[in-house]
């Protein structure tokens, strides 16, 4: 091969490398434009730096203002029994409320079934668990664009299900602060993530369920008594790693400080105190072995001191590596065991679960609005703003008295749900039923055409 030919091949290789690298740079530069930066990770790192400088923070800054509980802490059946006991004690009133509840069930069924079908159609091209025949693979920009559409369609459904988004400050607190009774701790590399978003409902402060706690029942030398912790009954995660895909997962009974344990890319690490205790135990045992065995070897085998120290250091290094490896394996197994019980649904199944939860919250809001407005002089007559404010105040006070939970009730939305119900029983819901997201549900003309058809086949 001549020098000139070699130079031409080298220049061609440099040009191909430039094109390949340029395409990768252009692809990742599209990520903020396609996803709208759901989580600015650089800003998240800055917030994490603030919490690292704090001494033993107990909760995120201004947590009471950051997180407002909106979940109604009763099932539909429990709420129906409470409303009957409180406001509909006569047989006629009870029958009327039960008929109204069945009417709301019927009116919302088609609405959320259609919403779920549209949402699953959006998610199907990027579903990693698809069991049907393989479809043509998407390019990275197409996949990112599809993920953006799914997340945009998912947010109003989560809002109707009364999930509250966790702020960037709360996530920074969760990534930095570790509870002292969490024996298993993990670490993540933010550079591996494109976006991270959490939603939560059902905040509780108390002892966590046994199978959902990670190492909180034992210390290093003795058992530790259970302590009260801040945790959530349900948590939804949406995360995307570089080179990966959109991860949608739901978990139960998750502590605020344990959110990072739910992320897809993590490494188990040994806490500093446990690492120090293990090192101390290794040093003490090593000194005892050296005193009891090393001196005998020096005197009997006439081995050089430097060689003996070298062999002893190698032996202790192997032993330390084995001890720490076994410790990390045990912690990883315990974390996997706990996540097995915490996990409730993921990916496509999560969409179905969210649609059912949103429908139930929709029904509960309509039942509360119906029962409380029936007690109000004039009912729903008057200005909508005044009516919704009165409804919100009355329902929040009643929920606090019944459950002890400070719940923020969405009065305007509940009033809109009540007013959108069909005027007579036995009919499909009218097109005026509030749409959670026009992009998901389609145009009003398409909805009208669907509603004008006969009963759907079972």
Swiss-Prot record:
Subcellular location: Membrane
Keyword Nucleotide-binding among UniProt keywords: no
Example of a GO biological process term: hematopoietic progenitor cell differentiation
Keyword field contains Phosphoprotein: yes
Pfam families in UniProt: DUF3754
Residues modified as Phosphoserine: 329
Taxonomy, superkingdom: Eukaryota
Record's bilayer topology term: Multi-pass membrane protein
Transmembrane segments annotated in the record for this chain: 277-297, 298-318
UniProt entry keywords in alphabetical sequence: Membrane, Phosphoprotein, Transmembrane, Transmembrane helix
GO CC annotations on file: membrane; mitochondrion
PANTHER family: TRANSMEMBRANE PROTEIN 143, TRANSMEMBRANE PROTEIN 143 FAMILY MEMBER
Name of the protein in question: Transmembrane protein 143
Species: Mus musculus (Mouse)
Gene this protein is translated from: Tmem143
């Amino acid at each position: 091969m001549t020098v000139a030919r070699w130079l031409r091949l080298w220049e061609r290789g440099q040009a191909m490398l430039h094109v390949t690298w340029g395409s990768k740079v252009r692809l990742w530069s599209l990520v903020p434009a396609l996803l709208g930066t759901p989580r600015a990770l650089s800003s998240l790192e800055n917030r994490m730096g603030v919490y690292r400088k704090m001494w033993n923070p107990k909760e995120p800054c201004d947590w009471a203002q950051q997180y407002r509980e909106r979940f109604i802490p009763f099932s539909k059946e429990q709420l129906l029994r409470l409303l009957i006991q409180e406001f509909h004690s006569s047989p006629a009133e009870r029958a009327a409320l039960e008929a109204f509840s069945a009417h709301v069930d019927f009116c919302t069924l088609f609405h959320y079934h259609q919403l779920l079908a549209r949402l699953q159609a959006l998610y199907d091209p990027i579903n990693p668990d698809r069991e049907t025949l393989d479809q043509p693979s998407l390019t990275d920009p197409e996949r990112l664009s599809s993920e953006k559409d799914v997340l945009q369609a998912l947010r109003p459904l989560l809002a109707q299900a009364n999930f509250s988004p966790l702020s960037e400050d709360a996530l920074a607190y969760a990534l930095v602060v570790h509870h002292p009774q969490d024996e298993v701790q993990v670490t993540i590399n933010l550079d591996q993530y494109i976006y991270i978003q959490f939603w939560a409902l059902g905040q509780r402060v108390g002892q966590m369920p046994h199978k959902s706690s990670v190492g909180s029942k034992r210390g290093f030398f003795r058992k530790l008594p259970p302590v009260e912790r801040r945790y959530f009954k349900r948590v939804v995660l949406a995360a995307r790693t570089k080179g990966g895909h959109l991860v949608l997962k739901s978990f139960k009974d998750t502590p605020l400080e344990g959110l990072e344990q739910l992320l897809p890319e993590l490494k188990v690490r040994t806490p500093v105190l446990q690492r120090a205790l293990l090192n101390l135990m290794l040093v003490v045992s090593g000194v005892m072995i050296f005193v009891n065995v090393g001196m005998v070897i020096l005197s009997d085998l006439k081995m050089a001191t430097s060689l003996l120290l070298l062999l002893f250091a190698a032996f202790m290094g192997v032993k330390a590596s084995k001890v720490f490896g076994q410790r990390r394996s045990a912690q990883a197994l315990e974390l996997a065991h706990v996540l097995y019980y915490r996990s409730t649904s993921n990916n496509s199944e999560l969409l179905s679960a969210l649609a059912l939860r949103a429908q139930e919250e929709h029904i509960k809001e309509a039942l509360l609005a119906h029962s409380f407005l029936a007690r109000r002089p004039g009912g729903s007559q008057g200005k909508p703003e005044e009516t919704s404010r009165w409804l919100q105040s009355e329902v929040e006070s009643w929920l606090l008295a019944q459950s002890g939970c400070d719940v923020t009730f969405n009065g305007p939305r509940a009033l809109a749900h009540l007013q959108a119900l069909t005027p007579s029983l036995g009919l499909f819901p009218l097109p005026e039923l509030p749409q959670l997201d026009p992009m998901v549900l389609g145009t009003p003309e398409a909805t009208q055409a669907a509603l004008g058809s006969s009963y759907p086949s079972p």
